[in-house]
Amino acid sequence: QLDNAKDYFIKTGTYSSKFDFRNAHVVKGKEVDELGEYLLYIHYLANMMASPLNTDAQGNAGCIYGVSTTNEWVVREYINPASSLPEIYHGLKMQNELRCFIDADNKEDPLLGIVQYWNPDVMKKHLDKVSETGNPDAYHDYTIYKMYEETLKNQFLNTKDMVAEQITELAKHLNLHGQWSVDVMQNGDDFYLIDMALAQDSALLDQIDSERLKQSEENWLPDLSRFV
Protein backbone atom coordinates (compact mmCIF):
# COMPACT_ATOMS: atom_id res chain seq x y z
CA GLN A 1 0.00 0.00 0.00
CA LEU A 2 1.30 3.44 -0.93
CA ASP A 3 1.84 6.12 1.69
CA ASN A 4 0.55 9.44 0.40
CA ALA A 5 2.91 11.22 2.79
CA LYS A 6 5.83 10.06 0.61
CA ASP A 7 7.13 10.85 -2.87
CA TYR A 8 7.50 8.08 -5.44
CA PHE A 9 9.45 7.41 -8.63
CA ILE A 10 7.67 5.53 -11.41
CA LYS A 11 8.60 3.92 -14.72
CA THR A 12 7.65 1.06 -16.97
CA GLY A 13 9.93 -1.96 -17.14
CA THR A 14 11.89 -0.25 -19.91
CA TYR A 15 11.11 3.48 -19.83
CA SER A 16 11.12 6.24 -17.23
CA SER A 17 10.26 9.46 -19.10
CA LYS A 18 13.54 10.90 -17.80
CA PHE A 19 13.57 13.77 -20.29
CA ASP A 20 10.30 15.01 -18.84
CA PHE A 21 11.08 14.06 -15.27
CA ARG A 22 8.04 15.72 -13.73
CA ASN A 23 5.96 12.80 -15.00
CA ALA A 24 8.28 10.27 -13.32
CA HIS A 25 8.35 12.00 -9.92
CA VAL A 26 5.03 11.61 -8.09
CA VAL A 27 4.78 14.09 -5.21
CA LYS A 28 3.15 13.23 -1.88
CA GLY A 29 -0.52 13.95 -1.34
CA LYS A 30 -2.97 14.24 -4.20
CA GLU A 31 -0.51 12.99 -6.82
CA VAL A 32 0.01 9.72 -4.95
CA ASP A 33 -3.76 9.18 -5.00
CA GLU A 34 -3.60 9.72 -8.78
CA LEU A 35 -0.44 7.66 -9.33
CA GLY A 36 -2.20 5.28 -11.70
CA GLU A 37 -2.80 8.15 -14.11
CA TYR A 38 0.92 8.92 -14.16
CA LEU A 39 1.70 5.28 -14.93
CA LEU A 40 -0.85 5.23 -17.75
CA TYR A 41 0.62 8.40 -19.20
CA ILE A 42 4.24 7.24 -19.38
CA HIS A 43 3.07 3.83 -20.67
CA TYR A 44 1.06 5.60 -23.39
CA LEU A 45 4.05 7.85 -24.16
CA ALA A 46 6.31 4.82 -24.58
CA ASN A 47 3.76 3.18 -26.90
CA MET A 48 3.52 6.34 -29.00
CA MET A 49 7.27 6.25 -29.60
CA ALA A 50 6.71 3.06 -31.58
CA SER A 51 4.44 4.93 -34.00
CA PRO A 52 5.74 5.59 -37.54
CA LEU A 53 4.62 9.19 -36.93
CA ASN A 54 7.04 9.55 -34.00
CA THR A 55 9.61 12.37 -34.17
CA ASP A 56 12.59 13.03 -31.93
CA ALA A 57 13.55 16.35 -30.33
CA GLN A 58 15.15 17.50 -33.59
CA GLY A 59 12.03 16.69 -35.63
CA ASN A 60 13.48 13.55 -37.22
CA ALA A 61 10.90 10.86 -37.91
CA GLY A 62 11.49 7.33 -36.75
CA CYS A 63 9.77 4.44 -35.05
CA ILE A 64 11.40 3.51 -31.72
CA TYR A 65 9.79 0.15 -31.17
CA GLY A 66 11.86 -1.19 -28.27
CA VAL A 67 10.78 1.35 -25.68
CA SER A 68 7.59 -0.36 -24.59
CA THR A 69 8.19 -4.07 -25.01
CA THR A 70 6.95 -4.81 -21.50
CA ASN A 71 3.75 -4.66 -19.48
CA GLU A 72 5.64 -4.04 -16.24
CA TRP A 73 5.10 -0.94 -14.13
CA VAL A 74 7.59 0.03 -11.45
CA VAL A 75 6.93 2.13 -8.34
CA ARG A 76 9.59 2.82 -5.73
CA GLU A 77 10.15 5.39 -3.01
CA TYR A 78 11.71 8.56 -4.36
CA ILE A 79 15.32 9.17 -3.32
CA ASN A 80 15.33 12.78 -2.17
CA PRO A 81 18.43 14.32 -3.77
CA ALA A 82 21.18 15.61 -1.50
CA SER A 83 22.96 17.33 -4.38
CA SER A 84 23.18 21.12 -4.37
CA LEU A 85 23.33 21.17 -8.17
CA PRO A 86 20.33 22.51 -10.10
CA GLU A 87 17.76 20.58 -12.13
CA ILE A 88 17.36 19.84 -15.82
CA TYR A 89 14.68 17.98 -17.82
CA HIS A 90 11.80 19.53 -15.83
CA GLY A 91 12.84 18.44 -12.36
CA LEU A 92 15.71 15.94 -12.66
CA LYS A 93 18.40 16.91 -10.17
CA MET A 94 21.91 16.61 -11.60
CA GLN A 95 23.89 14.17 -9.46
CA ASN A 96 26.92 11.99 -9.94
CA GLU A 97 25.81 8.90 -11.85
CA LEU A 98 27.97 6.10 -13.14
CA ARG A 99 27.14 3.41 -15.69
CA CYS A 100 28.94 0.10 -15.29
CA PHE A 101 28.93 -2.61 -17.93
CA ILE A 102 29.23 -6.18 -16.68
CA ASP A 103 29.38 -9.69 -18.09
CA ALA A 104 27.37 -11.78 -15.65
CA ASP A 105 28.74 -15.01 -17.15
CA ASN A 106 32.36 -14.06 -16.43
CA LYS A 107 32.71 -14.48 -12.67
CA GLU A 108 36.49 -13.99 -12.75
CA ASP A 109 36.51 -10.60 -14.49
CA PRO A 110 32.89 -9.38 -14.85
CA LEU A 111 33.51 -5.63 -15.23
CA LEU A 112 33.60 -4.56 -18.88
CA GLY A 113 34.00 -0.87 -18.08
CA ILE A 114 32.64 2.12 -16.21
CA VAL A 115 31.62 5.45 -17.77
CA GLN A 116 30.21 8.79 -16.69
CA TYR A 117 26.44 8.73 -17.18
CA TRP A 118 26.33 12.48 -17.87
CA ASN A 119 28.78 12.04 -20.73
CA PRO A 120 29.94 15.53 -21.86
CA ASP A 121 30.10 14.74 -25.58
CA VAL A 122 26.66 13.11 -25.64
CA MET A 123 25.01 15.73 -23.43
CA LYS A 124 26.36 18.77 -25.26
CA LYS A 125 25.60 17.32 -28.69
CA HIS A 126 22.04 16.47 -27.67
CA LEU A 127 21.27 19.73 -25.87
CA ASP A 128 22.91 21.86 -28.55
CA LYS A 129 20.74 20.30 -31.26
CA VAL A 130 17.57 20.67 -29.22
CA SER A 131 18.45 24.30 -28.45
CA GLU A 132 18.57 25.05 -32.18
CA THR A 133 14.80 24.53 -32.32
CA GLY A 134 14.36 27.60 -30.10
CA ASN A 135 13.06 25.57 -27.16
CA PRO A 136 13.61 27.72 -24.02
CA ASP A 137 13.73 24.63 -21.78
CA ALA A 138 16.56 23.24 -23.89
CA TYR A 139 18.47 26.53 -23.58
CA HIS A 140 18.06 26.30 -19.82
CA ASP A 141 19.26 22.69 -19.66
CA TYR A 142 22.24 23.36 -21.95
CA THR A 143 23.33 26.38 -19.91
CA ILE A 144 23.00 24.54 -16.60
CA TYR A 145 24.90 21.51 -17.86
CA LYS A 146 27.76 23.64 -19.21
CA MET A 147 28.01 25.46 -15.88
CA TYR A 148 28.43 22.22 -13.91
CA GLU A 149 30.15 20.00 -16.48
CA GLU A 150 33.49 20.04 -14.63
CA THR A 151 31.83 19.47 -11.25
CA LEU A 152 30.09 16.33 -12.53
CA LYS A 153 33.27 15.12 -14.21
CA ASN A 154 35.30 15.50 -11.01
CA GLN A 155 32.64 13.71 -8.96
CA PHE A 156 32.80 10.82 -11.41
CA LEU A 157 36.59 10.62 -11.33
CA ASN A 158 36.63 10.71 -7.53
CA THR A 159 34.22 7.78 -7.17
CA LYS A 160 34.63 5.54 -10.21
CA ASP A 161 37.32 3.26 -8.75
CA MET A 162 35.32 2.59 -5.59
CA VAL A 163 32.10 1.96 -7.54
CA ALA A 164 33.93 -0.27 -10.02
CA GLU A 165 35.28 -2.36 -7.15
CA GLN A 166 31.86 -2.72 -5.52
CA ILE A 167 30.04 -3.58 -8.76
CA THR A 168 32.73 -6.11 -9.68
CA GLU A 169 32.18 -7.90 -6.38
CA LEU A 170 28.39 -7.71 -6.77
CA ALA A 171 28.50 -9.09 -10.32
CA LYS A 172 30.34 -12.20 -9.15
CA HIS A 173 27.28 -13.21 -7.13
CA LEU A 174 24.45 -12.21 -9.48
CA ASN A 175 22.16 -14.98 -10.67
CA LEU A 176 21.99 -13.50 -14.18
CA HIS A 177 23.27 -14.37 -17.63
CA GLY A 178 24.53 -12.12 -20.40
CA GLN A 179 25.93 -8.60 -20.43
CA TRP A 180 24.25 -5.76 -18.60
CA SER A 181 24.53 -2.07 -17.86
CA VAL A 182 24.24 -1.16 -14.18
CA ASP A 183 23.51 2.45 -13.18
CA VAL A 184 24.71 3.76 -9.83
CA MET A 185 23.69 7.14 -8.39
CA GLN A 186 25.55 8.99 -5.66
CA ASN A 187 23.35 10.79 -3.14
CA GLY A 188 25.46 12.49 -0.50
CA ASP A 189 27.62 9.75 1.04
CA ASP A 190 25.28 6.98 -0.15
CA PHE A 191 25.26 5.10 -3.43
CA TYR A 192 22.18 3.48 -4.98
CA LEU A 193 21.86 0.94 -7.77
CA ILE A 194 18.99 2.59 -9.64
CA ASP A 195 18.66 0.79 -12.97
CA MET A 196 19.81 -2.13 -15.11
CA ALA A 197 19.35 -3.03 -18.77
CA LEU A 198 20.79 -5.34 -21.38
CA ALA A 199 24.15 -3.92 -22.41
CA GLN A 200 23.30 -4.14 -26.11
CA ASP A 201 20.30 -1.84 -25.57
CA SER A 202 22.17 0.71 -23.44
CA ALA A 203 23.58 4.11 -24.35
CA LEU A 204 27.35 4.67 -23.99
CA LEU A 205 28.12 1.09 -25.04
CA ASP A 206 30.39 2.54 -27.72
CA GLN A 207 32.85 3.51 -24.98
CA ILE A 208 33.46 -0.14 -24.08
CA ASP A 209 36.03 -2.41 -25.76
CA SER A 210 34.03 -3.98 -28.59
CA GLU A 211 36.10 -7.19 -28.47
CA ARG A 212 34.58 -8.04 -25.08
CA LEU A 213 30.98 -7.44 -26.13
CA LYS A 214 28.49 -10.07 -27.24
CA GLN A 215 24.85 -10.12 -28.26
CA SER A 216 22.22 -11.40 -25.87
CA GLU A 217 19.46 -13.60 -27.22
CA GLU A 218 16.00 -12.26 -26.43
CA ASN A 219 13.08 -14.66 -26.06
CA TRP A 220 10.27 -12.70 -27.71
CA LEU A 221 7.94 -15.71 -27.69
CA PRO A 222 7.19 -17.47 -24.40
CA ASP A 223 8.14 -21.12 -24.02
CA LEU A 224 4.78 -22.75 -23.30
CA SER A 225 6.11 -26.32 -23.35
CA ARG A 226 6.83 -26.17 -19.62
CA PHE A 227 3.07 -25.96 -19.00
CA VAL A 228 2.31 -29.15 -20.96
Model region roles, listed by residue range:
Residues 97-98, 180-182:
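Short loop/turn microsegments at loop-to-beta-strand junctions
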Residues 10, 182, 194:
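Active-site flanking residues adjacent to catalytic metal/cofactor-binding acidic residues
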Residues 154-165, 172-178, 186-228:
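C-terminal active-site "lid" helix and adjoining low-complexity regulatory extension at the edge
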Residues 101, 183-186:
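Conserved protein-kinase catalytic-loop segment immediately C-terminal to the catalytic Asp
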Residues 1-97, 101-111, 115-168:
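Active-site nucleotide/adenylate-binding loops and adjacent lid/helix of ATP-dependent enzymes
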